[in-house]
Amino acid sequence: MAPVTLSTVDDDLKEVIQHLFEIQSAVHGYLGPETQQELVRKIKNLTLALSTLSTHTKPHPPPPPPPQPTDPTTAAAPALRDNPDPPLSSIQLPPEIIDYVDAARNPDIYTREFVELVQRGNQDLKGKKEAFASFRDVLAREMRSAMPECRGEVERVLEGTGGKRER
């Protein structure tokens, strides 16, 4: 059996949503016994669509890996990330995002908060890096003036760490 792809599950979800919309419309326009059979049919269709979705999203054991070519001139299979419609079993979501959705929150908010957190961390690291670079340069300048006999070692350390050389 071929692996279920993301587009298959996407189509199944769209079908479930369509059936829910049809049921909502049928309930809104409910006229009594004459529309009851139509409503029952729509509910049965929804049940079938949910069953299909459940079947497609059940975890299956991963397929065995394809045999590796022995000829080095044979081109390797394209990477999974290059596939626009990957198998469902290859998609892994961080548990934090799943918890966010379970708590009825928008996963885009999680993404935005994560990006802001990373930016803050990057700014902190940049500040520390600049502070240490400034400290390195000041220390080198002071060591050159206090211990002229170590000038060569100081220059070597500055070259190795990307510091400013004194002319």
Swiss-Prot record:
Pfam families: Med10
Cystine connections: none
Compartment list: Nucleus
One example GO MF annotation: transcription coregulator activity
Main localization, broad class: nucleus
Keyword terms: Activator, Nucleus, Transcription, Transcription regulation
Biased composition (Pro residues): 60-70
UniProt-listed InterPro entries: Mediator_Med10
GO process annotations (BP): regulation of transcription by RNA polymerase II
Region (Disordered): 54-92
GO terms for cellular component: mediator complex
Assembly with partners or alone: Component of the Mediator complex.
Role summary: Component of the Mediator complex, a coactivator involved in the regulated transcription of nearly all RNA polymerase II-dependent genes. Mediator functions as a bridge to convey information from gene-specific regulatory proteins to the basal RNA polymerase II transcription machinery. Mediator is recruited to promoters by direct interactions with regulatory proteins and serves as a scaffold for the assembly of a functional preinitiation complex with RNA polymerase II and the general transcription factors.
Similarity annotation: Belongs to the Mediator complex subunit 10 family.
Protein name: Mediator of RNA polymerase II transcription subunit 10
